[in-house]
Amino acid sequence: MLTSSGPRFLRDGQPHLIVSGAMHYSRVHPEQWADRLRRLRAMGANTVETYVPWNFHAPAPGVFDFTGGADLARFLDTAASEDLDIILRPGPYICAEWEGGGFPGWLLADPAMRLRTRNPAYLAEVDRWFDELIPLVAERQHPNGGRVVLVQVENEYGSFGDDHQYLEHLRDGLLARGITVPLVTSDGPRMNWLLAGAVDGALPTMNFGSRTGEHLDTYAREFPDVPPMCMEFWHGWFDHWGEGHHTRDADEVAGELRTMLSHGMSVNFYMGVGSTNYGLWNGANHDGGLQPTITSYDYDAPIAENGALTRKFHAFREVIAAHIPVPDLPSDLVADPPALAPRELEPVASGVLTCDDLERLSLATVDTVPGLRAVTDAVPEPPTFEQLNLERGLLLLRAEVAHAGGPVPVRLHGLHDRAHVFIDGRLAGIVGRDEGVPETLEITAERGTLRVDLVVESMGRINFGPHLGERKGVLGGVWWGNRFVNDWRAYPLALDMIGGAVAAACALDRDTTGADGLSFRQLALDVASDEAGADANISTSRRGRGFLWVDDAMLGRFWHIGPQQSLYCPGPLLGAGAHTVTIIETDAPLGAADGAVVLVAEAELDGVNSASLAAELS
């Protein structure tokens, strides 16, 4: 069992240095879990750390899913079989650049909900979630024959609030549900963060990426009887759309690691394993404007998004080997994982999904998603995502407006985050928050009754800071000239959960020539028997902005502004035979007529298109 004695950890009574790597099971295909864990162990890690995203397991109130890619028990058991201890961070808040910091969007349907506080409605839902989750974890603790050795209380709470009754409720809830291994907290290295995030009975750990010596001094001065640990060693970083790709020099961060280990500081590499925000699971930040996170979560990790062992892997392994025993590096891990050869994908269908098509798609799939509902009888205000239990995706809002003729300003108040505005089926414009594009359009139309369709997109729920818990949709209503529009119907599209239906809708034989809507195309991807199971890098650098599926699996978003210009497709999705790539494009390529979709040899993660970005924001 892992314990602590003064400034050091003990494992089964012997001094122990934790060398851990973060791997998010929710971001890795489950058939690749064992491979990535094996690579982590080969680097010298003796532990794996993972978050548990609440919303990944709870698609609707009282509905819980621990199957497939959400099979947490399988992941924990696989880690144990690869000879790794486990640090579990169950939240309920996780940050992690994950959709909403792990909070289900349906929590926000309650206007009185206050996240990360002792708000009774919030705590009731946390308790219901922990009743499902924590017993599964408790039976896999080290004293019970498993490999879970540490469990974290909340996450970086010192950067958010000071409701210590809330932290105590979480701590007591973990203990009451059977957690017996040591508890920890995790906060930035400033004392005000560490103190605000602390709770009695939990060991404080720090998150940082540099100035290790200063943080060791803080431990020695402020926490002399606590084993020093960097719970998040930020040797890399995440990317936002429209910004540069973040990397850090391998030798520089290896030097920080050397300082940690030589002074007895345990460490968790954040990230140890690069991965992917499949579907629409990316989060967002807000710093003067919305900053959605890209689809890739490669993070410049020692083990790349595709499993390749990077220079950082070897630099870290060398430092680790000087402090703890490191297993031999298996020869089959040295070469990069196989990838499909570069080729251009052959188009097989293309067209437009009109707003009527989107309505039909919504009504055909609404009953297949837990808790999802449409509004087919008009209501006075445009329903929000949360009111429809729409976690992610698109929302078609439809109304009819009596128009006197001529020009009129149309404003979408509180738009979160982006909308295509159609008048009588024709695209009038695109509006968005914080993109350099206005929330107001000037509409000119003949006198009469007009049909107004808004296709609203959530670009990712904010996962950190004071904007955490923002709702999605048109929150303040639609202003037509000098009056509100008050008769709305709503049709939700949970795109990442209805991939098969999306592909089928795009495959329908119909003439959409001259129609406005969201353009689509389908392409053939044929995999030979000797290529089966290889990964693919699907380059969208010649396309605009939208969503991409392989068969019924949504890989994620693409956007010409970069930095990411290709999407990673894991090999388990690519068996021998014919596959279909489906693209729904919300924005056409700038200055290009019709760009091809191609497979490329390597991931394109560092391709900020500055010209496209300037045009997008002009």
For the regions a protein language model found, what residue spans apply to each?
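Aromatic-lined ligand-binding clefts that engage carbohydrates, nucleic acids, or primary amines
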Residues: 407-422, 452, 525-551, 558-559, ...
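N-terminal carbohydrate-binding accessory modules
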Residues: 1-47
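Active-site neighborhood of glycoside hydrolase catalytic domains
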Residues: 122-199
